[in-house]
Structures are given as C-alpha cells and as structure tokens.
A protein has these predicted regions:
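Histidine-rich, glycine-flanked metal-binding segment
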Residues: 29-38, 47, 51-96
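Bacterial N-terminal signal peptides that target proteins for export
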Residues: 2-12
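Active-site neighborhoods of metal-dependent hydrolases
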Residues: 176-182, 186, 244-397, 489-500
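Bacterial N-terminal signal peptides
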Residues: 12-23
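C-terminal helical cap
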Residues: 45, 338-348, 353, 366-369, ...
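Divalent metal-coordination and catalytic microenvironments
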Residues: 45, 61, 66, 92, ...
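Divalent-metal coordination cores built from histidine and acidic residues
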Residues: 29, 36, 89-104, 116-218, ...
C-alpha cells in the first residue's frame, strides 16, 4: 500500500512537470513591443489567409527578419521550439494578414489644431492595420513620414502615397503628373477634372507606371470615362450611379454643389434614380477594364443614422479634441455638414445604402475587385476603428466574412500592385500580420480594442481585442499602443481645459 502511494505521488509529480513544461514551452516569450527579431515563431495558431480560403491549422509560422520564412503543421513534440528565443503563443488564437487601409488620410491637423502623427499611427496599428494608402494629406510631410516608416524610425504602418494630380489643361496636368513621379509618389489621386484633362492625366500616369485613384465628383465625367481611360480604383461610389442615369440627376433648382449640406443630402437620392439595367452594363464595363471599387461604406454612415455616429463608444477614450472640434457642424470644414439633418434625410440614405450595397455585391459577382478603406478624420469616423466598422458593413452588404477579410487584405494588395508581397500569409511574403484571441469570422467586433462582452458560466467576460500586430517583422503589442493613444488624448484634453 505504501509503495502504491509513493508510485502515485511520483506519477502525479511527473504529470505536473509534464503539464508545466508544456505550458512553459507554449508561453509567449522573448517578445518586446516594437522589436524585430532575426527569427520569430508564431506557434500553434489558426490561420485565416487573405485569399478567400477557410481557416487552417493549427500551424506554426516562422518569421525571419521582415519575411515569412515557412509555414508548417503545428509540432506536437514537446521540445520542438525549446531553444527558440522569440515565440508568440498562438494556441486557440487566429493569425491574419495585416489589414490594408486602401483609403486613408495622414492628417497632421484638424480644426486648425495640431494632431500628432503618433496618434493616427498607433490607432491604425492597434487596430491591426499594417498598410495605409494615403490619398490626400500634406505631401511634403507625408513623404518624410513614409521614409521614416520604411526605415523603422517611427511606429507606423507602411505608407503608400498617392499625390493629387491637377492641371488647368491637358499639358499642365501632364507636367504635374511627371512632377509627382519625380517626388517619389506611389500613385496619383484625381478629382474635379474635365474629361480631356482626366484623359491626359491617366495617359501620363500609365506611361510612368503610376496607379491612380479617382474620387469622381458631380462632373462631366463618370464611371464610363474611368473604364475607358484606365483608372485603377474608384473611391466611394461617385460616378457609378451617375453613369446609369438618363440625363442629369433630378436636382432642385436651388441646389448648390458647393454647399455640402445640399451635396450630401441629394447624394442620398441618387442611387434610386439609376436605371438598373444600365447600371449592370456600367458594372460589367468596369469589371472588363479591371477597375477596382473601394466603396468606403463607413464614411457615410452618419447620413443614415446620425445619432449613432455622434455617440460611438470609443469616443470616450480615443477622440482627440482637435477631431472632436472638427466633427462639429461647420461649413468651413469638409464633411462637417450635418446641420438640420432630418429623419427624412436618413430614410433616403438608408434606401441609398440598400441599392449601393446591392451594386457592390453585383460588381463582385461579375468578378470585380472590391477593396476596403475608411476615409477617417471626417464625418465622425476615427482612424482604425472605422476600418473595423467597414468590415462589418461589407458583411451587411452580403459578403461572407471570409470574403470580407480578402477585401481588406488580398484584394487591397492587388489594388496597390503589391499582391506578390502583401495581403497573404505565405513564405516569402512580407511579415505583416495580426494575432487576435477570438475568431473574427464569428464576429468582427472581436477586432475592436475592447472586444465584446459575453456570458460564460453565468458571468460576464470580455472576449476579443487584437493582441499583436506585426508590421515588416516588427512586433507590436496592440494593447500597449492603444494605451499610448489614450494617454495622448488625455493630455490633449488637459491642455485644452487649461486654455479654457
């Protein structure tokens, strides 16, 4: 009996040591915020790729420097990575390609108040965004910020800079596009152009291997012209329903496009005026010509539900006072037009969304490339957080969550011309990744900083929140980044109170 008790104790100790060794070996170790390592192991993780395929795993993903070196079945051997110095424990977690924000603005001020780049960058990284296509900012500053990001001198996403092309004649716009190329831009953004000037701008861009994004205003050009002249992507939705009209939109006689209250109110009437059969032809033509569509559903959401937009829960901790001031209705600020916004306006916009979302879905079914962007810093939308909301809106539009992830990763990489380097978890690709504790395919809200509240065994628990964001092999602890953002906001509010 005594020998049996001794044996049982020995067995218990051995089992304890075995379990302890497994726990120790699976723990995250040797990881510091903001560091890149010669070799990093992300162990025992479920991979959601950016190519539209379902989750796979558990897998071990090996990163060397800034590249994904290998992906293999998770090792079941206890000591497989015993000698590894830098390990992220992925057990029960999900690894995705870093999110790409295809429509961003790197603002350095709002409402005539300075806005630190650090605030934007850490919000983006904290929300899993590892690349941003900037389509409008202070270009001299942004070129320098891009250099710092490339060299790892600042904690920031990758920056792809699309500078505005302009000109009062075809000759002038060609010279401007050439200058944009010389300054090192990755592409051009065009808007507010007559047809002959747009044609010249895009022709010159093609000669110089520059991609182009188009914010189509209410102009003489529309999506037919974008297809003919070879635009890379249409931003928002302008120009697409316009191309399916028979003549002009039914504007009232007193309408003034320069009055943004008029502009956005009657934009909410446009989709219902588009001829459905003609619209299908427009979409088909865009697909045939390889034009991508970046709908940015999120930036107009205030138009269909203003009170929701004004009272987003993260404003409490993450809304910088400069942006808060900018969001207040003010005709001097672009996008701050919600004065006397009515229930009727919201009803029109809700119908607008239904038709618009159906069109994006039809475009995708035809083979069109749909991208994900946020356009934050305007109309009550915060950087990073609004991109996660955009994922939810793509799901609302009828896309499967797997396809939504593809929109924000693989598709966006294609729009950038970086599909051989970004947007997928694949050996040889750049190590832009995010690790989250719960499955975003179950609920995109798991990607928000605070995750979601759930019920387990009669108790309310928190689930979700991105744990780690990896950009160019540099490992960032997302909660630490977001803590820094909260501190920036708190200090800015204190400074503002002292002024008052």
């Amino acid at each position: 009996m005594k020998n049996l008790q001794v044996k049982l104790k020995v067995i218990s100790i051995l089992l304890f040591l075995l379990v302890l060794s497994q726990v120790l070996l699976s723990e995250t170790r040797g990881i510091e915020n903001g560091k890149r390592y010669d070799r990093l192991v992300i162990r025992d993780v479920i991979v959601i790729n950016g190519n539209g395929t379902p989750p796979r795993g558990p897998l071990d993903v090996i990163v060397e420097g800034n590249r994904i070196q290998s992906i293999r079945r998770a090792s079941l051997e206890r000591d497989a990575y015993e000698k590894e110095e830098h390990v992220l424990d992925g057990k029960g977690k999900y690894l995705l390609p870093g999110l790409i924000n295809i429509h961003g603005h790197i603002h350095d001020s709002r409402a005539n108040q300075s806005l630190p780049f650090e605030y934007l960058y850490k919000l983006w990284l904290g929300c899993g965004i590892t690349s941003v296509r900037d389509v409008g900012s202070n270009y001299d500053k942004t070129i320098e910020e891009r250099r710092k990001s490339q060299e790892g001198l600042v904690d920031a996403p990758r920056i792809f800079l699309y500078m505005r092309a302009w000109g009062r004649s075809p000759e002038e716009v060609r010279r401007n596009v050439q200058e944009v190329k010389k300054r090192g831009a990755d592409g051009i953004k065009v808007f507010g152009m007559d047809r002959d000037i747009l044609k010249a701008a895009l022709d010159e861009a093609h000669k110089l291997s520059l991609r182009a994004a188009h914010h189509v205003g209410v102009e003489e050009i529309d999506a037919w012209d974008d297809a003919e002249f070879g635009i890379t992507s249409i931003e928002h939705w302008y120009g697409i329903p316009d191309a399916a009209l028979h003549g002009s939109q039914n504007f009232p006689h007193w309408y003034n496009y320069s009055n943004e209250d008029d502009r956005f109110r009657y934009a909410g009437h446009l989709w219902r005026e588009a001829d459905p059969e003609k619209l299908k032809k427009v979409l088909k033509r865009l697909v045939e010509k390889g034009v991508a569509w970046c709908p940015t559903f999120v930036i107009y959401e205030a138009n269909r539900d203003l009170l929701r937009a004004m009272n987003q829960p993260w404003f409490k901790e993450y809304l910088h006072p400069a942006i808060e001031e900018y969001f207040n209705p003010n005709p001097a600020y672009h996008g701050s037009y919600h004065w006397n916004w009515s229930t009727t306006d919201e009803i029109f916009w809700r119908e607008n969304y239904k038709i618009w979302m159906a069109a994006v879905r039809e475009f995708s079914k035809m083979g069109g490339i749909v991208g994900v962007g946020e356009d934050a810093g305007y109309i009550y939308m915060l950087y990073g957080l609004s991109l996660i909301r955009e994922l939810e809106l793509h799901q609302e539009a009828g896309f499967h969550p797997i396809d939504v992830i593809k929109h924000a990763t693989g598709n966006n990489a294609r729009i950038l011309g970086m599909e051989d380097k970004l947007g997928r978890i694949r050996p040889g690709y750049l190590a832009d990744l995010l690790l989250v504790g719960d499955n975003p395919l179950e609920n995109f809200k798991f990607l928000y900083p605070d995750g979601v509240q759930d019920l387990k065994e009669g108790k309310i628990i928190s689930r979700g929140g991105i744990e780690w964001t990896i950009k160019d092999g540099i490992v960032y602890h997302a909660p630490t980044l977001l803590k820094d953002v909260r501190k920036i906001v708190s200090l800015a509010r204190e400074k503002q109170q002292l002024k008052e």
